[in-house]
């Protein structure tokens, strides 16, 4: 309880909600072009239909949105070479800004933001973008492995669901967060602290996904308040929720590691 209280207090001191809003906004902007780009890249290996189906399956496990909406995003953005080129450009900019905001936010929590040189910022951005691409590739292998295990158990649907819809997303999310919490701070971070923070954030995101998806199914989403913009509101709200949880996990790592520079009132956040 004491650690949790300290995390919440420091999260407020570090203007965590404002940073989460920035990260969430750029995350929201990067989701559609990421889906289109992943489908386009997958089309070089398998058929476009197979690639789009795989991308929708993967995204739906992290995003509480209707499959029809996700499918429409992909179908509306593929087929035109010019559109794909623009999409890739938008993805490069928006994804870069997601990681830029995340890097700044986490280093604010460590009181190290003033020690980030321009070169290190660019290196961290490139590293995180490469790691994200690596996790996407890893998801293909894990998906195939999960299918093979399910078939070994006689094609059990329950085992297939457990592996593909639960264990694989959790493993990918946990691995990505451990790497983020370990590599981003401008100081040495213990892997044990990073793992604890990543585990807490992963559980928080999965629990929030369940609650948010249940709310959308039970109450029809944001249709009453936002009308035709309900889908946009859902994606933006979810991006904000995820960003808050990720930054709370980062704050937990800083509290556990006990290497954060004390607040001397010299920074503005």
Where are these regions (language model features)?
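Membrane-embedded alpha-helices and immediately adjacent juxtamembrane helical segments
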Residues: 1-269
């Amino acid at each position: 309880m004491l650690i949790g209280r300290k995390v919440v207090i420091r999260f407020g001191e570090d203007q965590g909600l404002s940073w989460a809003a920035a990260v969430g906004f750029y995350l929201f902007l990067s989701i559609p072009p990421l889906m289109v780009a992943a489908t386009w890249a997958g089309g070089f290996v398998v058929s476009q239909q197979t690639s789009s189906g795989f991308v929708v399956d993967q995204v739906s496990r992290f995003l509480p949105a209707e499959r029809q909406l996700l499918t429409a995003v992909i179908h509306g953005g593929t087929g035109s070479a010019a559109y794909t080129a623009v999409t890739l450009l938008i993805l490069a900019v928006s994804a870069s800004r997601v990681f830029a905001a995340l890097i700044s936010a986490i280093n604010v929590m460590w009181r190290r933001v003033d020690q980030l040189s321009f070169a290190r910022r660019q290196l961290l951005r490139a590293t995180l973008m490469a790691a994200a691409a690596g996790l996407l590739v890893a998801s293909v292998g894990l998906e195939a492995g999960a299918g093979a295990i399910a078939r070994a158990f006689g094609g059990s649907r329950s085992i297939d669901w457990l592996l593909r819809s639960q264990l694989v997303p959790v493993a990918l999310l946990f691995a990505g967060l451990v790497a983020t919490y370990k590599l981003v701070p401008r100081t040495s971070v213990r892997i044990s602290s990073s793992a604890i923070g990543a585990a807490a954030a992963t559980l928080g995101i999965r629990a929030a996904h369940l609650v948010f998806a249940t709310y959308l199914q039970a109450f029809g989403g944001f249709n009453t308040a936002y009308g035709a913009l309900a889908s946009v509101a859902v994606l933006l709200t979810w991006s904000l929720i995820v960003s808050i949880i990720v930054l709370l996990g980062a704050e937990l790592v800083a509290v556990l590691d006990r290497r954060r520079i004390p607040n001397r009132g010299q920074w503005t956040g």
